Amino acid sequence: MHRKDFIRRSAILTSALGSAGLLQASAFSTNKRSGALELVVNAGVSGNNTNNLLKRIDTDCLAYKPGLTIMMIGTNDMNNGKFVPPDKFRTNLRELSGKIMGSGSKLLLMTILPFYEPYLLTRHPADFFQPEGPSGKRVAMNTIIKEVAAEKSASFFDVGSLFEKVGKIGTDKDSLLRNEENSKKTDGVHPTPNGYRFLGLAVSQFIQFNQLPVERIVCFGDSITCGDGSVDGESYPAYLKKLLS
C-alpha cells in the first residue's frame, strides 16, 4: 500500500465509522502488578514534557514490558510554561528512545499535532515564539522527532500531517480539535471525540500496515495521549484498543 493510499484510506474510514457511531471502546483496566498481558495501556499525563517522561518511564512504561511503545511528546516542550530548548529536547528524546528500545520494546515515534494559533496565543505570549512563530516551532520539533526516529531506527508516523489535511483546524464545528463551536472551549490543541477516533484509527492502520506488535502496547505521552485518562472512553488509546481487539 502506497503512503497516499494509506492516508486516503484512513480519512475515508474515519469519516464513515465516526458518522455511523461504530467506534466504541470496551471496558479495560490496567494492572502492572498482576503481570497480566494487557493489550493497551494509557500512560499519558496532562502537562508532561520530555523531562517528565524521563522521570516516570520506568514505572509508567517499562514496568509493563511493552511489545510496542507509542510516544507522542513535544507540545508542552515548545510552550513557555514547560519549555525545553530544542537541543535538550533532542537529547531527552534520544534517551527516552534508547531506554525503550533497550528494554526490547519496539518504538513508534509520532509527530505532535497542529493547533489553532489564535487560541494558543491567548494562553502563551506571542513574543515567546519569535522569530519563527508557534507553527514554525512545531515544525522544528517535528523535524527533531523525525531525525531521532531515523537515528534510532524506530518507526515514525507523521500523524500531525493527517490532522493538518483533514482536521479542519480552526473554528468550524466539525473541526477535529476542540473549539467554541464544538466544545464551548477556546482550546485549539486537544482533539474532540471524533479527533480521538481519527487518531486511534490512523495509528491502528499504521501499526497493522507496518506489522508492529499488537499486544502490550504502551501509549506514552502528555494530555493528547491521556484524553480522559481511560482505555474505555475518549482517548486514542481507547479507540486503538478497540480496533486491535
Where are these regions (language model features)?
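C-terminal segment of N-terminal export signals and the immediately downstream linker at the start
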Residues: 22-40
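Active-site metal-binding loops of divalent metal-dependent hydrolases
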Residues: 75, 222-223
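N-terminal export signals
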Residues: 5-27
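Conserved donor-binding loops in enzymes that form glycosidic bonds
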Residues: 45, 189, 193, 222
